[in-house]
């Protein structure tokens, strides 16, 4: 068999480093960024060749499902403790914007944290929820449900078809969406649709 190329070795080493550091393999996009390949098809080609060499094994029905076939790496069964949560659109936690109802990617999280298949993540921009510890650029973990108690943080769709992250309060004749920022005022609506309850926040420290 032809000798493994330097680029293939670079990709293999990067996958190993990511699995050791994070407990799960990188995405195709992350591999490309790490080794300087802009084309995802080129990355897939290198992964195919690594798989033919018996160095990795992939489950193409699942995102990021790459197993390194060496004794010092976690097996695919051990990696099954990770759940791949869909990241859906982008919700503004300041001025609401129309929600984009498509899955942008799948994000790996420990299964014991997620606890349910009925969850998704949303990226947040704006500072209206800073007092609740939700900052600009965070991703919120949301459990899909159509009801919530007063004071809970939810993803709510307004009458105008816009989505926002706020605390919800059902008052006598209106629904109040309350920001967690002393400089911002509450928003009032006749009706809103609850798209889910926020159960966690993910933040990357740069």
Curated annotation (Swiss-Prot):
<keyword id="KW-0805">Transcription regulation</keyword>
<dbReference type="GO" id="GO:0004252">
    <property type="term" value="F:serine-type endopeptidase activity"/>
</dbReference>
<feature type="DNA-binding region" description="H-T-H motif">
    <location>
        <begin position="28"/>
        <end position="48"/>
    </location>
</feature>
<dbReference type="GO" id="GO:0009432">
    <property type="term" value="P:SOS response"/>
</dbReference>
<dbReference type="InterPro" id="IPR006199">
    <property type="entry name" value="LexA_DNA-bd_dom"/>
</dbReference>
<dbReference type="InterPro" id="IPR050077">
    <property type="entry name" value="LexA_repressor"/>
</dbReference>
<dbReference type="InterPro" id="IPR039418">
    <property type="entry name" value="LexA-like"/>
</dbReference>
<feature type="active site" description="For autocatalytic cleavage activity">
    <location>
        <position position="128"/>
    </location>
</feature>
<dbReference type="InterPro" id="IPR015927">
    <property type="entry name" value="Peptidase_S24_S26A/B/C"/>
</dbReference>
<keyword id="KW-0238">DNA-binding</keyword>
<dbReference type="Pfam" id="PF01726">
    <property type="entry name" value="LexA_DNA_bind"/>
</dbReference>
<keyword id="KW-0678">Repressor</keyword>
<keyword id="KW-0378">Hydrolase</keyword>
<keyword id="KW-0068">Autocatalytic cleavage</keyword>
<dbReference type="GO" id="GO:0003677">
    <property type="term" value="F:DNA binding"/>
</dbReference>
<keyword id="KW-0227">DNA damage</keyword>
<comment type="subunit">
    <text>Homodimer.</text>
</comment>
<dbReference type="Pfam" id="PF00717">
    <property type="entry name" value="Peptidase_S24"/>
</dbReference>
<protein>
    <recommendedName>
        <fullName>LexA repressor</fullName>
        <ecNumber>3.4.21.88</ecNumber>
    </recommendedName>
</protein>
<keyword id="KW-0804">Transcription</keyword>
<feature type="active site" description="For autocatalytic cleavage activity">
    <location>
        <position position="166"/>
    </location>
</feature>
<feature type="site" description="Cleavage; by autolysis">
    <location>
        <begin position="93"/>
        <end position="94"/>
    </location>
</feature>
<dbReference type="InterPro" id="IPR006200">
    <property type="entry name" value="LexA"/>
</dbReference>
<keyword id="KW-0234">DNA repair</keyword>
<dbReference type="GO" id="GO:0045892">
    <property type="term" value="P:negative regulation of DNA-templated transcription"/>
</dbReference>
<comment type="similarity">
    <text>Belongs to the peptidase S24 family.</text>
</comment>
<dbReference type="InterPro" id="IPR036286">
    <property type="entry name" value="LexA/Signal_pep-like_sf"/>
</dbReference>
<dbReference type="GO" id="GO:0006281">
    <property type="term" value="P:DNA repair"/>
</dbReference>
<dbReference type="GO" id="GO:0006508">
    <property type="term" value="P:proteolysis"/>
</dbReference>
<dbReference type="InterPro" id="IPR036390">
    <property type="entry name" value="WH_DNA-bd_sf"/>
</dbReference>
<dbReference type="InterPro" id="IPR011991">
    <property type="entry name" value="ArsR-like_HTH"/>
</dbReference>
<keyword id="KW-0235">DNA replication</keyword>
<dbReference type="GO" id="GO:0006260">
    <property type="term" value="P:DNA replication"/>
</dbReference>
<comment type="function">
    <text>Represses a number of genes involved in the response to DNA damage (SOS response), including recA and lexA. In the presence of single-stranded DNA, RecA interacts with LexA causing an autocatalytic cleavage which disrupts the DNA-binding part of LexA, leading to derepression of the SOS regulon and eventually DNA repair.</text>
</comment>
<keyword id="KW-0742">SOS response</keyword>
<dbReference type="InterPro" id="IPR036388">
    <property type="entry name" value="WH-like_DNA-bd_sf"/>
</dbReference>
<dbReference type="InterPro" id="IPR006197">
    <property type="entry name" value="Peptidase_S24_LexA"/>
</dbReference>
């Amino acid at each position: 068999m032809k000798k493994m190329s330097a680029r293939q070795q670079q990709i293999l080493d990067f996958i190993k480093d990511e699995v050791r550091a994070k407990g799960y393999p990188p995405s195709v996009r992350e591999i490309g960024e790490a080794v300087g390949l802009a084309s995802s098809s080129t990355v897939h080609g290198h992964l195919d060749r690594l798989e033919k060499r018996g160095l990795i094994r992939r489950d193409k029905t699942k995102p990021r499902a790459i197993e390194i076939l060496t004794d010092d790496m976690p097996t695919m069964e051990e990696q099954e403790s990770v759940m791949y949560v869909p990241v859906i659109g982008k919700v503004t936690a300041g001025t609401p914007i129309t929600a984009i109802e498509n899955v942008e990617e799948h994000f790996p999280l420990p299964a014991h944290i997620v606890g349910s298949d009925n969850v998704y993540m949303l990226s947040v921009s704006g500072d209206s929820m800073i007092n609740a510890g939700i900052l600009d650029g965070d991703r919120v973990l949301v459990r899909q449900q159509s009801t919530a108690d007063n004071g809970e943080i939810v993803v709510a769709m307004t009458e105008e078809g816009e989505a926002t992250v706020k605390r919800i309060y059902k008052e006598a004749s209106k629904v109040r969406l309350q920001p967690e920022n002393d400089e911002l005022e509450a928003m009032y609506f006749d009706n809103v649709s609850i798209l889910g309850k926020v159960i966690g926040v993910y933040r990357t420290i740069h």
